[in-house]
């Protein structure tokens, strides 16, 4: 990676501004999944162990008006982070002003401070989300000219707390998490060890058009599963019953199939049910066609076998999107089958592109078997699409 990283800087005695991604799920003020906090620890620890004073910025949820602030404070995160670091994290509970400035100026080497939810600044004119120049300049002024971006989950956004701060400091560098994310995902797509197989699931073709187009050029095979299967089926005139379909994307699906030169591999059967939720019948289809009055909710056993065969000998696998409604035990066999087929390939570099696939791997107990699980759904999608990420472009070149 040609960008500077946190290891390239002398941090001793410096107030170091750090963008992390602490956008964690909360229920009644309790964190239900702390993976993102844990993922930021190596960078935070490196800064404080090298005598820096870490000033952390993160968003939490969406905040558009005053009422949205309810339950969106980073206070529970500060408490959790204090426990993980074994040292008190200073939390003034504000995003600007004298109280914040005094707390920052009182920091000693090796201390950590967490600024309140950056999106609280969105209440009056979307200053954070629209990268308000004054806000970026103000936040940058709180440090000593060093900014570390370790929030891959927001790297595809140009916000005041990443791009805005970057523009107003001497050195904007990558943290360890951001560095690893880029290394794994970008290198997998740009310089893969072959055979390189991409697996794309999820419900909508519209979300993945750019990704499919880019991966058809880069990968040896692209396997399609999930709800978007049925848009590809209908584009070929295959009966899909009541399955999910994007009527306005049929032409694009047909075009992708035609120009794929056989690289695009679709399921050959489905697990169908007579309703999405209150179903009374679940069965495997004979072939591709879904029965009248039924809808496809997972790939079927023949498809799992076909995908296992397609993955045979793969050296690089990138997976984004589940094969079915994996949250329901009746429709998780496809996702489990594909996961198991990926991780059993000898010497495979296996990467999950965040979002629902990451949740599936974690919930179904396979997370530790993958080489890398991305922390950013939207950002990893844009990397897979071959796009430049604003948060990354804003960093200082080596």
UniProtKB/Swiss-Prot annotation:
ATP binds at residues 208, 296, 327, 354-357. It catalyses: (2R)-3-phosphoglycerate + ATP = (2R)-3-phospho-glyceroyl phosphate + ADP. Keywords: ATP-binding, Cytoplasm, Glycolysis, Kinase, Nucleotide-binding, Transferase. It is found in: Cytoplasm. GO terms for molecular function: ADP binding; ATP binding; phosphoglycerate kinase activity. Pfam families: PGK (PF00162). Its EC number is 2.7.2.3. GO terms for biological process: gluconeogenesis; glycolytic process. Substrate binds at residues 21-23, 36, 59-62, 119, 157. Disulfide bonds: none annotated. GO terms for cellular component: cytosol. Gene3D superfamilies: Phosphoglycerate kinase, N-terminal domain. It is an enzyme of class 2 (transferase). It comes from the Bacteria. PROSITE patterns: PGLYCERATE_KINASE. Pathway: Carbohydrate degradation; glycolysis; pyruvate from D-glyceraldehyde 3-phosphate: step 2/5. Belongs to the phosphoglycerate kinase family. Monomer. This is Phosphoglycerate kinase. It comes from Streptococcus uberis (strain ATCC BAA-854 / 0140J).
